[in-house]
Amino acid sequence: MTTLFHRVARGARLLTVASALSVAAFAHAQAVFKVTTIPEEAASEQIRKFGPLVKYLERTLGTKVEFVPVSDYPAAVEALVNKQVDLVWFGGFTFVQAKLRSGDKVVPLAQREEDTQFRSVFISQKDSGIKTLDQLKGKQVSFGSASSTSGHLMPRSFLLQAGLEPERDFKRVAYSGAHDATIASVVSGRVDAAALDITVWRKFVADNKVDTSKVDVFYTTPPYFNYNWSVHADMPVAQRD
């Protein structure tokens, strides 16, 4: 990681990203600066969440900025690799995938402080009797997208550390595709338990979108590195600075 990366990471969030891209001249002479993210939630929620960033970047860069939702995690990777977008919000795993797919031509630009100590949670219905990871044996368990760091890769890693092999020890392994769908699968009873991004869970709780008297967290993972904003290496260095 570069000195720029560490400097920008300390600032975090919208101002961090905007200041990292503060050179307003676009060497590509493009009409629209395009931003996307791994689709952790419904497209409508992504558009709402990233709306302030779009407006801020438009003011800062002096050009039109468009948020472009993608269908799934691999699509976010391919969008940056093929330079269909300019800036992407990746999880740790999708960032690695993009680096590999591009031949090491994806550059991490910014990371929030909280993403250096990120966590996932496992949730279940409170009357299920599930209180530990070991009690997931023989149960139906859902992850998010197979390419999700916080919704699959890291939770699976911690399960393996606990001696649990999902395909061997669980009755069924499901993939919901997104964190909000993961929560819904537990609420509806389609699965017994599930793993997801802690920030999405906290937002659902804060917005009263889930009844924690019925569904709640029974395990929180240790911390790990996760999200970052990335650009293609072909973006001029002056722009990144």
Task: Indicate where each model-derived feature is located.
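General small-molecule cofactor/ligand-binding pocket signal
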Residues: 66-68, 173-174, 216-218
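Periplasmic-binding protein-like
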Residues: 34-39, 114-121, 209-241
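Acidic, polar ligand-binding/catalytic clefts
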Residues: 78-135
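A ligand-binding cleft/hinge motif common to bilobed small-molecule-binding domains
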Residues: 92-103, 155, 160-161, 187, ...
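Bilobed "Venus flytrap"/periplasmic-binding protein-like clamshell domains
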Residues: 31, 36-58, 70, 93, ...
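Short hydrophobic/aromatic-enriched beta-strand-loop microsegments
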Residues: 106-111, 169, 194, 214-217
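N-terminal hydrophobic or amphipathic helices and topogenic motifs
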Residues: 2-8, 15-21, 27-75
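Short helices/loops that flank or line small-molecule/ion binding pockets
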Residues: 74-88, 101-102, 134, 178-199
